[in-house]
Amino acid sequence: MWIDCEMTGLSLADDALIEIAVIVTDSQLHALDEGIDIIITPPEAAVEQMGDFVREMHTTSGLLEDLPHGTTLADAQAQVLEYIKRFVPEAGKAPLAGNSVGTDKSFLDRDMPELIGHLHYRIIDVSSIKELARRWYPRAYFNSPEKNGGHRALADIAESIDELRYYRSVLWPEDEGPSSAVAKEKAQLISASPTLAATSEAQDTTAKAQAAEDV
């Protein structure tokens, strides 16, 4: 369940949710529908306190001009839930997916708890994969597709799906992955040298070396 939100800023105390878009994909990242995009009219106070950077961003995208024609939070949540239930009627099945989606989820926790309650507690965050690629496979990271969503929710979430499609194509094999035997072997190697035990052993080695130098 791919979701992207636009807000008047990042403060849960002062800022408002002003746009939400949803695209549903299958497990192979094929979109099942063209998606839904809803504009939410925020309190005037949230618009007035908007910072210059965010105001310029939403002016350039056209979102600021569209805000007076939006709907309420309650209606937006009802529309999104109705849309999602067409594809995933049972609660707790579909994970929330997106890009740096923790920020979006914070606002949805506050403003659309019924929506969050319908989703699975696990999250698929493309930004996590991107950060791993930057460290482990920099060529894949630096050649990733350019993003031109323009800070509108539906375009941004479509680009997030495409971004994961790209990373899947370059970082994961097209077949079914390792055999069960290979996977079990790798798991045993990790279990034989867990992170904390390896750290403790390294510290012991360093301490012994330091003690030898002090003699």
Residue ranges of predicted features:
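Conserved non-catalytic scaffold segment of RNase H-like nuclease domains
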Residues: 1-3, 7-98, 145, 196, ...
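Alpha-helical packing segments of well-folded alpha/beta enzyme cores
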Residues: 76-80, 104, 160
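Active-site-proximal helix-loop-helix substrate-binding element of RNase H-like nuclease domains
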Residues: 42-45, 52-54, 126-162
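Acidic two-metal-ion nuclease catalytic site recognized across multiple nuclease folds
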Residues: 147, 151-215
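Conserved beta-strand scaffold positions in the cores of enzyme catalytic domains, especially
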Residues: 96, 123-126
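Short conserved catalytic/interaction loops centered on acidic-Pro-aromatic/His motifs
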Residues: 116-120, 140-144, 172-179
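Substrate-recognition/cap helix-loop segment adjacent to the acidic, metal-dependent catalytic center
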Residues: 86-88, 103-122
